[in-house]
């Protein structure tokens, strides 16, 4: 696989000075850092390229060798700088000495922040529209109070690593270069635990279920995530905790359907009200309101009730609307007298095919007649 040019990776010219290289490196490293792009494999790969490029271009001797011989100078002598550094070692250990000035790891292996957690919460439509405060119970890993996260039985149980003399790094020679690598004895921490904590068995963390109060803002939708910073798993060796992401799922409502900020519902009306008009009560999430039905209303007609929908979760654009779709019901279980009255009404229309009072029916049957007339020509 052909490697990309280190100058192109950092976006600098070959004449760039140390300040320009460092500035570009910091900007790109912050952008593609795995902590900012959890689960993004392409970002992690880019991050490795950036760190590898900076490791070479920030060192005058390595940069001079690269300018003369390119990547080949690092691919000789047991894999050199380019090949050996990515082969199975821990990602943060490989580049810890390069990355310390940005992310606070000095030249020792950087303690990893705790893992992020996800909690799925199911809300009613009313809770999603108006907002709610919910208590949730989340199983997680918290810092062991007995050892305060150190993993040691006592402070006397923590001793300096004899391999690296407490530095967390050891010098390795590769070809004619001398490079630093994470100490294999202490994993880059510079300290070794002689006796582990009997509470957490040396991990520095224990399992606990935390009860948290979560404020759900008004207007959330299915798929929205609410981030609770620092409420994920505790980090090891005093590293910061991860975050908790509360994933919203909204239950199906028996009356309303939702589409972004608008609500929809079907409202049944009688045949007589559709013809003569009237007033009915319709439900909203704030209670019942009156809706005026004009005469000659057809089934399927939409009536918009402004401001009776869902509030924007970001407070932009105000509330949505409630759209009521009327459905004209055909009367059932008619008495003999009612049947006769309807028959008389039908006769007054000119029979079942009288079109004077049914404009849509007239248009339909006129179209049918024309269709068959065209067939017989």
Swiss-Prot record:
Zn(2+) 1 binds at residues 144, 147, 197, 200. CXXCXGXG motif repeats lie at residues 144-151, 161-168, 183-190, 197-204. GO terms for cellular component: cytoplasm. InterPro entries: DnaJ (IPR012724), DnaJ_C (IPR002939), DnaJ_domain (IPR001623), DnaJ_domain_CS (IPR018253), HSP40/DnaJ_pept-bd (IPR008971), HSP_DnaJ_Cys-rich_dom (IPR001305), HSP_DnaJ_Cys-rich_dom_sf (IPR036410), J_dom_sf (IPR036869). It comes from the Bacteria. Binds 2 Zn(2+) ions per monomer. Its cofactor is Zn(2+). Residues 5-70 form the J domain. Its main location: cytoplasm. Zn(2+) 2 binds at residues 161, 164, 183, 186. Disulfide bonds: none annotated. Pfam families: DnaJ, DnaJ_C, DnaJ_CXXCXGXG. A zinc finger (CR-type) spans 131-209. Participates actively in the response to hyperosmotic and heat shock by preventing the aggregation of stress-denatured proteins and by disaggregating proteins, also in an autonomous, DnaK-independent fashion. Unfolded proteins bind initially to DnaJ; upon interaction with the DnaJ-bound protein, DnaK hydrolyzes its bound ATP, resulting in the formation of a stable complex. GrpE releases ADP from DnaK; ATP binding to DnaK triggers the release of the substrate protein, thus completing the reaction cycle. Belongs to the DnaJ family. Homodimer. This is Chaperone protein DnaJ. The lineage of its organism: Bacteria, Pseudomonadati, Pseudomonadota, Gammaproteobacteria, Enterobacterales. The gene is dnaJ.
């Amino acid at each position: 696989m052909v490697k990309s040019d280190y100058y192109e990776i950092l976006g600098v010219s070959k004449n760039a000075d140390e300040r320009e290289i460092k500035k570009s490196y910091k900007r790109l490293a912050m952008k593609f850092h795995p902590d900012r792009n959890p689960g993004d494999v392409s970002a992690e790969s880019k991050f490795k390229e950036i760190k590898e490029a900076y490791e070479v271009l920030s060192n005058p001797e390595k940069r001079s060798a690269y300018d003369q011989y390119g990547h080949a100078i690092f691919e000789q002598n047991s894999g050199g700088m380019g090949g050996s550094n990515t082969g199975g070692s821990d990602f943060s250990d490989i580049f810890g000495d390069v990355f310390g000035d940005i992310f606070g790891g000095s030249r020792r292996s950087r303690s990893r922040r705790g893992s992020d957690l996800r909690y799925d919460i199911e809300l009613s439509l009313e809770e999603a529209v108006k907002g709610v405060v919910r208590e949730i119970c989340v199983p997680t890993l918290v810092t062991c109070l007995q050892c305060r996260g150190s993993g040691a039985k006592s402070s006397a149980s923590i001793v300096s690593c004899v391999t690296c003399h407490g530095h967390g790094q050891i010098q390795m020679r590769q070809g004619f270069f001398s490079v630093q690598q994470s100490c294999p004895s202490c994993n880059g921490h510079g300290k070794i635990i002689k006796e582990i904590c009997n509470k957490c068995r040396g991990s520095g963390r224990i399992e606990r279920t935390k009860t948290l109060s979560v404020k759900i803002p008004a207007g959330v939708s299915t798929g929205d995530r609410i981030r609770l910073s620092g409420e994920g798993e505790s980090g090891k060796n005093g590293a910061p905790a991860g975050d908790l992401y509360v994933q919203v799922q909204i239950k199906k409502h028996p009356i309303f359907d939702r589409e972004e900020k608008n609500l929809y519902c079907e409202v049944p009306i009688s045949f007589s009200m559709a013809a003569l008009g009237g007033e009915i009560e319709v439900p909203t999430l704030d209670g019942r309101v009156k809706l005026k039905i004009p005469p000659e209303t057809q089934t399927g007609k939409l009536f918009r009730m402004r401001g009776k929908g869902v509030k924007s979760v970001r407070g932009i654009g105000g509330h949505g609307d409630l759209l009521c779709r009327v459905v004209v019901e055909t009367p059932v279980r008619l008495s003999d007298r009612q049947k006769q009255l309807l028959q008389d009404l039908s006769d007054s229309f000119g029979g079942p095919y009288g079109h004077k009072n049914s404009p849509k029916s007239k248009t339909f049957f006129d179209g049918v007649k024309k269709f068959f007339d065209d067939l017989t020509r």
